[in-house]
UniProtKB/Swiss-Prot annotation:
Gene that specifies this protein: SHO1
Region (Disordered): 173-200
Primary localization class, coarse: membrane
Lineage, opening ranks: Eukaryota, Fungi, Dikarya, Ascomycota, Saccharomycotina
GO cellular component, one term: plasma membrane
Name of the protein in question: High osmolarity signaling protein SHO1
Location in the cell: Cell membrane
Keyword annotations from UniProtKB, A to Z: Cell membrane, Membrane, SH3 domain, Stress response, Transmembrane, Transmembrane helix
Transmembrane segments: 37-57, 69-89, 99-119, 127-147
Extracellular side: 58-68, 120-126
Residue ranges annotated as Cytoplasmic topological domain: 1-36, 90-98, 148-371
Length: 371
């Protein structure tokens, strides 16, 4: 079997791909100091590590039967502590939560193994070393529980609620909501071509009541010809019996008859019969013959919208290409919001672009910034 060779991307193309949809993270200690959980747990870990390393050095200088593998456990714990600090300072914890949880689990095994050897030793030096590794084991267990959980979990949301940066967004929750919304859009875009459903090119039975004052036709215009199959483009295979001209003549005849007051009662008596042939289009709500334009008011761009709230974006967000309702925004951007109910809010950018945004990516601020 001959495999087609895929050309390697050039340096410029690879660099462009790395920068695409990427957030630029800069080093800042404020990212660490603004999170009470990270600051407290890292401080306890650093203090416990100092106690453990001091006790191990003192114990190793006193006796020759000190467990050598404990040195690797202490060094490995310091490496994990250093990496966690770097992740917080660059605000990249959400990208490496799985790695932190797995690496901390390995460190938990190392520390508990060292604790079982040192805790039964005699002397204050071994007691200090055992106390240090026990404290490290406790912190490691807490880290496994926190970093191994999703940001949308109740415990993570409770812990992150005390942070100055607020609750962190959940990638898993956003992906599931995107999938559910995409499925709804696919169902809404389906076209039925059976006996009771017609494509979107079919004329709609709706006209403004203001335009028909005095000339109302209580019966909707419907097609009286035979039900013929549709081709892939949704066009009807016309014949001598179902030409569009006959359909137009029937409509004009109905309008002329409606001008005669004597035919008003007759039209009302035939209304139920005509309603049986009424078809349902894409804009029908399935229960009545009225349009459902108001149902999609959240996604409509027509008309003057009111955006009484002001929000500032906490992170950069790239809209899903498969969802036409989402909009992208940059970190620190000011948006106008019209509705703050639910997980997805309707917002307006300074450029005039309107769409929906995830609520956990923004925070409400005082309305003192002009768009």
């Amino acid at each position: 079997m001959v495999m087609d060779k895929v050309p390697m991307p050039s340096r410029a193309k690879a660099k462009a791909q790395r920068k695409k949809l990427h957030i630029n993270h800069s080093f800042s200690l404020n990212n660490l100091f603004s999170d009470p959980f990270a600051l407290s747990s890292i401080s306890i870990t650093l203090l416990s590590w100092c106690i453990a390393i001091a006790g191990c050095i003192a114990t190793a200088s006193d006796t020759d039967n000190f467990p050598r593998f404990t040195w690797w456990g202490i060094a490995y714990q310091f490496l994990i502590l250093f990496m966690v600090i770097i992740f917080y300072c660059y605000d990249m914890v959400d990208y490496y939560k799985n790695f932190i949880a797995g690496a901390t689990a390995v460190s938990f095994v190392y520390n508990t193994n060292s604790a079982t050897i040192l805790v039964y030793g005699d002397g204050s030096r071994k007691a200090a070393a055992s106390a240090g590794v026990i404290l490290l084991s406790i912190v490691n267990l807490i880290w496994i529980f926190y970093y191994g959980s999703d940001n949308a979990s109740p415990t993570s949301r409770w812990i992150d609620s005390f942070s100055l940066r607020g609750i962190r967004p959940s990638a898993t929750q956003d992906a599931s909501m995107r999938a559910r919304r995409r499925n709804r859009n696919n169902l809404r875009s389906q076209r039925f071509t059976g006996d009771n459903f017609y494509p979107e090119h079919q004329p709609q039975n709706y006209m403004s009541s203001m335009a028909l004052t005095g000339f109302e036709n209580p019966d909707p215009a419907y097609y009286t010809g035979p039900n013929v199959p549709l081709d892939r483009n949704g066009s009807v295979a016309y014949s001598d019996n179902n030409m569009p001209g006959a359909f137009t003549q029937d409509m004009n005849a109905n309008n002329q008859n409606n001008l005669n007051p004597n035919n008003f009662n007759q039209n009302n008596s035939n209304q139920n019969t005509f309603n049986q042939n009424t078809f349902m289009t894409e804009t029908s709500n399935g229960n009545t013959d009225t349009t459902m334009g108001g149902t999609l008011e959240l996604y409509s761009d027509a008309g003057e919208e009111s955006f009484p709230y002001t929000a500032q974006t906490l992170y950069r967000y790239q809209a899903d290409e498969d969802d036409a309702y989402e909009i992208s925004f940059e970190q620190g951007e000011i948006l106008k919001v019209s509705d703050i109910e639910g997980r997805w809010w309707k917002a307006k950018r300074s450029t005039g672009e309107t769409g929906i945004i995830p609520s956990n990516y923004v925070k409400l601020i005082e309305d003192n910034i002009a768009m």
